[in-house]
């Protein structure tokens, strides 16, 4: 599939913007394969995004045209099992600069041409995985667990553009119970999310000197479906 950004945008020197992919003239490319057998689905995919963060730079009050590009690859595997009473789904992503998908990450500046101000970049990589398990028909208990780890960059960087680039790891767990009858769904859900924040290690783009912040959330729902 060839994809263009509209509502969900990549991060860059000017925050979230469509101009990075517009100036790149290269759409996002995704290729995947799925295997299905009865209630089981297993698949994998690869995604490429190529962005142009800037087209000009200013050095000593002079404006220079620059040719910048950052291209990154991301990989994912996924599975889903569905039976009369069971639903099990899981996914794991090795991501690189996936801010347009609401993921944490981005890219950093690895070098600057002192004459023209042209910059070269190194993408931030992270690993994220989640699993969701649901059982039952009328009464449905369910659990969800997700984890994300910042893997840093391949090169030394001086500055980062992205989302949550000061987060080292993120952990989220959810337990819920729903009561399901025709046209109605009643439920309660508890979620605990913890994030470990810190400072950028410029030598590898990782986050160091971390401390954790946790959030507790309790949600009750009543849905009428027609």
Language-model segment annotations:
Residues 39-167:
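Detector for outer-membrane/organellar transmembrane beta-barrel domains
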Residues 20-21, 67, 210:
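Alpha-helix capping and helix-loop boundary segments enriched in small/acidic/polar residues
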Residues 173-198, 211:
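C-terminal closing repeat unit and adjoining cap/tail of repeat-based domains
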Residues 1-62:
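Aromatic- and glycine-enriched pocket-lining scaffold segments that form the walls
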Residues 181, 212-226:
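Outer-membrane beta-barrel "beta-signal"
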Residues 154-156, 196-206, 210:
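A glycine-biased, small/acidic residue-tolerant capping/turn segment at secondary-structure junctions
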Residues 27-31, 73-77, 127-131, 171-175, ...:
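Hydrophobic, lipid-facing positions within transmembrane beta-strands of outer-membrane proteins
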Residues 35-37, 80-83, 135-137, 179-181, ...:
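Residue-level signature of outer-membrane beta-barrel architecture
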């Amino acid at each position: 599939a060839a994809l263009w950004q509209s509502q969900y945008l990549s991060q860059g020197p000017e925050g979230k913007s469509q101009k990075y992919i517009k100036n790149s003239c290269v759409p996002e490319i995704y290729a995947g394969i799925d295997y299905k057998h009865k209630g089981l689905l297993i698949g994998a995919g690869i995604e490429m995004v190529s962005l142009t963060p800037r087209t000009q730079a200013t050095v000593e009050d002079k404006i220079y045209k620059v040719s910048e590009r950052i291209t990154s690859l991301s990989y994912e595997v996924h599975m889903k099992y569905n039976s009369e009473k069971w639903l099990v789904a899981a996914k794991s992503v090795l991501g690189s600069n996936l801010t347009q998908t609401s993921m944490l990450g981005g890219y950093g500046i690895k070098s600057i041409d002192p004459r023209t101000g042209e910059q070269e970049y190194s993408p931030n990589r992270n690993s994220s995985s989640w699993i969701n398990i649901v059982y039952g028909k009328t009464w449905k208990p369910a659990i969800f667990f997700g984890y994300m780890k910042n893997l840093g960059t391949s090169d030394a960087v001086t500055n980062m553009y992205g989302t949550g680039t000061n987060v080292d790891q993120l952990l989220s767990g959810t337990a819920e119970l729903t009561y399901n009858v025709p046209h109605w769904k009643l439920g309660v859900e508890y979620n605990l999310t913890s994030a470990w924040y810190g400072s950028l290690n410029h030598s590898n783009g990782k986050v160091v000197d971390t401390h954790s912040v946790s959030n507790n959330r309790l949600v009750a729902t009543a849905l009428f479906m027609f």
